[in-house]
């Protein structure tokens, strides 16, 4: 299916006023048999290792991108939760990210340009690989994280990074039994002469499941040449005791969420992460099977529970630092996902500009 074919499908749905859900590999959410799938839109269109840029069709999987860039000792520093069977299109449409966002940022920081089909069937290009963007709008950032509610993403251009010579992960011992202990530790880690690629806080439940101990632990992913990594490890060892853990820990964290889980993301200023962490831990202390992990550099706590149950509404009211974002509530009906966090009237006006008949779904898979 080409971009032109996708545009024709969208125009037909727009003429009929028929809702048109968008699907990728359906690894996270299946919008049903009537969805417009871009999973067949696979393949790398252009890869210039010397420029550290790559353009791929939206249905290209993260695994395919990892293989291609790995052969050049490069990588796309997006590690969204789930598996590498997910597509780059869905990753960008949902602005999904993982632990590497600590150092490298989110999709809005890494996506250089897009090709997309708007809700009236128009084909547009934004950002990279074009001479001129639409005046007054950063459409690349607008479409990234819009959950398919503004346009069908058909092609993505991303920024790559060189892979570090050494990539090592350590576990830093954490005391969070005293009210100020975690905050003090995180302050010392931030002040240390180290620049972790990822810095992820794990609650005891997920730490035990992944074989990282039975208490709260802080994982630090260190990268660089051998001398740099040794120096960073020594700096962090001066803060608290450290042990080496396997690199597969990061893949295990990303793949730990079952499809039926509730996933709720809460955020605060990074300096207030310890306070938010304590609030979430206390609120979920009697929630069987619940666990949490936090991306320190983003100030974000990710709460996962196998059975949302009635307690989910309580979680939505205890966010210590900001509005919670519901990524998924298992199979519970009646919940949606706010794709942008924008005021409703502003979001309605934006959607009407790109999808005048309201046919595009705010769901992506």
What are these language model-derived features?
Residues 1-20, 38-84, 92, 96-129, ...:
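N-terminal glycine-rich flavin-associated loop
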Residues 1-27, 318-339:
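N-terminal accessory segments
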Residues 22, 198-204, 291-296:
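Short beta-strand
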Residues 25-29, 41-43:
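Short active-site-proximal "capping" loops at secondary-structure junctions
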Residues 39, 242-365:
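Conserved glycine-rich FAD pyrophosphate-binding loop
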Residues 63-65, 177-184, 226-234, 272-279, ...:
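Short, conserved charged micro-motifs
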Residues 112-262:
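C-terminal substrate-binding/cap subdomain adjacent to the FAD-binding core in PCMH-type
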């Amino acid at each position: 299916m080409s971009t032109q074919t996708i545009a024709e499908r969208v125009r037909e749905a727009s003429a009929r006023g028929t809702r048109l859900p968008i699907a990728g590999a359906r690894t996270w959410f299946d919008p049903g048999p009537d969805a417009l799938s871009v999973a067949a839109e696979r393949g790398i269109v252009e890869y210039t290792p010397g420029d550290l840029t790559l353009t791929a069709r939206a249905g290209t999987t993260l695994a395919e991108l990892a293989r291609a860039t790995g052969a050049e000792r490069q990588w796309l520093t997006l590690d969204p939760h789930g598996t590498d069977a997910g597509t780059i299109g869905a990753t960008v449409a949902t602005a999904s990210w993982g632990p590497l966002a600590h150092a490298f940022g989110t999709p809005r920081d890494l996506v250089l340009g897009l090709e997309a089909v708007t809700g009236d069937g128009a084909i547009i290009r934004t950002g990279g690989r074009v001479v001129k963007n639409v005046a007054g709008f950063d459409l690349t950032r607008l479409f990234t994280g819009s959950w398919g509610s503004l346009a069908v993403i058909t092609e993505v251009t991303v920024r790559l990074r060189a892979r570090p010579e050494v990539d090592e992960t350590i576990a830093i011992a954490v005391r969070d039994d005293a009210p100020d202990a975690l905050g003090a530790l995180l302050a010392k880690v931030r002040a240390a002469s180290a620049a972790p690629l990822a810095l992820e806080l794990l609650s005891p439940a997920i730490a035990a499941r992944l074989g990282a101990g039975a208490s709260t632990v802080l994982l630090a992913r260190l990268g660089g040449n051998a001398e740099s990594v040794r120096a960073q490890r020594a700096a962090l060892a001066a803060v608290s005791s450290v042990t080496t853990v396997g690199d597969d820990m990061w893949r295990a964290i990303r793949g730990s969420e079952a499809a039926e889980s509730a996933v709720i993301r809460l955020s605060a200023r990074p300096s207030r992460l310890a306070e938010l962490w304590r609030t979430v831990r206390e609120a979920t202390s009697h929630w069987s099977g619940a666990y949490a992990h936090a991306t320190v550099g983003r100030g974000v706590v990710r709460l996962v529970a196998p059975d949302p149950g009635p307690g989910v509404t309580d979680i939505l009211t205890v966010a210590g630092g900001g509005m919670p974002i519901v990524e998924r509530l298992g199979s519970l009906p009646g919940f949606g996902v706010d794709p942008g966090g924008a005021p409703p009237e502003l979001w309605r006006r934006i959607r009407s500009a790109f999808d005048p008949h309201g046919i595009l779904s705010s769901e992506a898979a």
